[in-house]
Amino acid sequence: MTILLYDLVGADPARPFSPHCWKTALSLAHKGLDWQSVPTPFTSVPAVEGGFSKTIPVIRDGDALVADSFAIARYLEDTYPAQPTLFGGAGGVGGARFVERWSQLTIHPYLGTVALLDIHDRLAPADQAVATAGLEHWLSAVRAARSATRR
């Protein structure tokens, strides 16, 4: 059975851009599982699988629905133990969780500042309007920081 991965896309459905979805795609590929990307625009996320999660990635594996890239990796590890491991054992789970948390606290804020406007510009117009309404306060700070560095 093919596992469905709901994958965040912008105006071009062939170019998924979420690093969290990429982590899941890489996990599925590493496990050698049969999977298919379901291109999902920003405004369609709330409707994925009947509103199962506010965010993606989400996978559907038969009757199972799992959200969050780390939870998905744990699910894949537990459900497909005969496939290559993602963590290399219990110690690897803790190490992976540490790296995830560290990157969320130290790298993600910077990457968000650097990439947010580029991501916004690559969204479909309807998605841009919704994203702008929800992130205008953040976008204005990013615009100010960007223009200050480009003088």
Question: What are these model-derived regions, one by one?
Answer:
Residues 1-129:
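GST-like domain detector, emphasizing the conserved glutathione-binding G-site
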Residues 125-151:
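A conserved mid-domain beta-alpha-beta active-site/ligand-binding segment of alpha/beta enzyme cores
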